[in-house]
Amino acid sequence: MKKVFILLALKYYILNSIIRNGENLYKKIVIPTDGSDVSLEAAKHAINIAKEFDAEVYAIYVVDVSPFVGLPAEGSWELISELLKEEGQEALKKVKKMAEEWGVKIHTEMLEGVPANEIVEFAEKKKADLIVMGTTGKTGLERILLGSVAERVIKNAHCPVLVVKKPKKE
């Protein structure tokens, strides 16, 4: 009985510590997704938080135009863009299905641009309280050359960012 009381007291303390002035701290949560396993894992965390606090969820997919700027062939960009948009629709569909299964209200949106910039701008526009995203955990030269979308979002976001790291292989 004592253990049950301690667990209930702990849950009560945690819930009260993230509620301000009688309002939930998290009302709007943004989930950037690329369809990868780690982004879907991040979506699970975000949807769980949203369920707990009755928050709205915005799942977004950003068609990254930066690698294709300056392509010589005219039709190349249109073809690549269409493929990326199809990939984005699939990624958003997975997150939407997950949210609906949990009974969480979700909006999906496809954006185009530089991912970190678009994520930050979207979160600001929607007045999001939290961004939840995955990261592959790039290291070394790859990180120096390419940077980390999650790192740039953390540096520039107006709200807290929860980053879910790719699990280590066993």
UniProtKB/Swiss-Prot annotation:
Pfam families: Usp (PF00582). Disulfide bonds: none annotated. It comes from the Archaea. InterPro entries: Rossmann-like_a/b/a_fold, Universal_stress_UspA, UspA. SUPFAM superfamilies: Adenine nucleotide alpha hydrolases-like. Gene3D superfamilies: HUPs. CDD domains: USP-like (cd00293). Belongs to the universal stress protein A family. This is Universal stress protein MJ0531. It comes from Methanocaldococcus jannaschii (strain ATCC 43067 / DSM 2661 / JAL-1 / JCM 10045 / NBRC 100440).
